[in-house]
Amino acid sequence: MSDLSKRDQHVLEAVVTDYIHTGEPVGSRTISKRYGVNVSSATIRNVMADLEEMGFLHQPHTSAGRIPTERGLRFYLDSIMQFKALEEREREMIREAFRNELPDVKELLRRTSRVLSRFCRQAGVVLWPKLTLTLFKRIEFIRLRAHQIMVLLVSKTGLVHHTLVEWEQDIGQEELDKYSRYLNDLLEDMPLGEVKQRVLEEMRDEKVLFDQLYSRALKITDRVFQQNLESSDVYIEGRTNLLNNPEFADVDRMRRILDAFEDKSRIIRLLDRTLRNSTGVQIILGTENDLQELNEISLISSPYRRGDTLLGVMGVIGPLRMDYSRIIPVVEFTADLLSQLLEEPGED
């Protein structure tokens, strides 16, 4: 990133701040009047011209003013912006939104997406936790009918994965209960991402090879883990908030945005990318996300956890012209609060 002088940074900050609040191109006189830049309008115009030449600002042909480019926004976010600390009143309002008792993890995550949407006035998104990132709590086998078994895989976090298994032999419920007890002892507290390998190792054990109970229990479990436990879902709340942004008033642009939200896999791919770097708030601007359908929006995201275990990611999607200094602290606080609330379900 280019080095900018203090004056250059001051002018860039003024342009970004004004553009975020108004959505309109910013002129030198506006900067001179509103932002206390103690130089003439002519000097400010020269600085803005230099910033445009360096790729930080852009001048729409219909206007004498300028707007920040993605590069300008990125420099502002990384080097200039100062967060607005949440007031205690705002923190309490967010806490209050979670105060009613929530029946399960699913409803807690859905509530989180609503809270983000409401407080940030954009789209709130929460990526459903990946089972493979959580710890094993128990497995249950339920005989539904001859040759058909329902397998319930439960994580320490309270997530439940259902799998229907068609089995060659008919197995009674009493024997299935023995399978559960054996596997619950074997796999206790193991990361679910490691269970498949542990089952394969156990299947090669000599004593297991000659024990029908152990062998059959492991084979059924192996079949469960051959399915895709990596699959994700995402809760999205407040799509219509995006349409209130003037950037999306254009019908074609609005249709592209709504189509992108309709296909959840695109949003999941965007959120999955942020899981690779699982510490703190991340911001992905426009074309940085590699998904052409989403290159007109920004994502502000933060991971959420249960204890030391990373579960997923949540955040806010909006236009490039979001009030980052206000929204980032909301996302950060809500992620911390969600992580605290997730300590409660799934305890032994």
Swiss-Prot record:
Keywords: Repressor, Stress response, Transcription, Transcription regulation. One of its GO terms (molecular function) is DNA binding. One of its GO terms (biological process) is negative regulation of DNA-templated transcription. Gene3D superfamilies: 3.30.450.40, Heat-inducible transcription repressor hrca homolog, domain 3 (3.30.390.60), Winged helix-like DNA-binding domain superfamily/Winged helix DNA-binding domain (1.10.10.10). InterPro entries: GAF-like_dom_sf (IPR029016), HrcA (IPR002571), HrcA_C (IPR021153), WH-like_DNA-bd_sf (IPR036388), WH_DNA-bd_sf (IPR036390), WHTH_transcript_rep_HrcA_IDD (IPR023120). Transmembrane segments: none annotated. The keyword Mitochondrion does not apply. Negative regulator of class I heat shock genes (grpE-dnaK-dnaJ and groELS operons). Prevents heat-shock induction of these operons. PANTHER family: HEAT-INDUCIBLE TRANSCRIPTION REPRESSOR HRCA. Belongs to the HrcA family. This is Heat-inducible transcription repressor HrcA. The lineage of its organism: Bacteria, Pseudomonadati, Thermodesulfobacteriota, Syntrophobacteria, Syntrophobacterales. The gene is hrcA.
